[in-house]
């Protein structure tokens, strides 16, 4: 649960089965593991006022991803591209490359350095978006930062793939786990 500490989580809020305000389709709360009371307010800080007739009413909150779904989609796209590069590399190196052999990846896979640099830029953009949502850097970005840093290293020297192929694949797997973890928002 601490994995998404600081990242807003979204809830669809219904009263008696109806969404009283458009904003309640994906109302954001800042995740915190502790119990607390929040006043539901608009962007202007004014509390929402809901007229209720005398009697019993049901208020429900349903987990929804809201704006976070766009980030997840972007990370999934990056994972797909990273896997495509991995498959191209192992066609040449095999899954257990000799770290001392020169596979001449720069010439056999031209443009790979540029692809890796572009994926690094995409991850940087995602990291910046997450920081903007959370207001601070946190645990949620660590996996993304690790992958981005490795991409920066490899984009400058694709020949290093033979030395870091296992960690590259592990970092891709970690991104997949990240997607799974952030998709499951706690209640």
Please place each PLM-identified region on the residue numbering.
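Extracytoplasmic
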Residues: 1-186
């Amino acid at each position: 649960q601490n994995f998404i500490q600081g990242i807003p989580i979204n809830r669809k809020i219904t009263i008696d089965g109806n969404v009283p305000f458009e904003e309640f389709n994906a109302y954001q709360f800042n995740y915190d593991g502790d119990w607390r009371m929040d006043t539901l307010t608009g962007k202007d800080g004014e509390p929402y006022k809901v007229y209720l007739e005398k009697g019993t009413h049901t208020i429900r909150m349903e987990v929804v991803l809201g704006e976070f779904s766009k980030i997840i989609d972007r990370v999934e796209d990056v994972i797909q591209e990273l896997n495509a590069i991995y498959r191209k590399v192992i066609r040449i190196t095999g899954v257990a490359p000799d770290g001392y052999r020169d596979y001449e990846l720069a010439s056999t896979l031209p443009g790979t350095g540029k692809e890796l640099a572009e994926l690094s830029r995409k991850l940087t953009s995602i990291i910046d978006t997450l920081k903007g949502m959370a207001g601070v850097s946190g645990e949620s970005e660590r996996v993304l930062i690790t992958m981005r840093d490795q991409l920066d290293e490899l984009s400058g020297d694709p020949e290093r793939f033979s030395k870091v192929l296992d960690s590259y694949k592990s970092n891709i797997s970690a991104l997949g786990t990240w997607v799974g973890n952030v998709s499951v928002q706690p209640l």
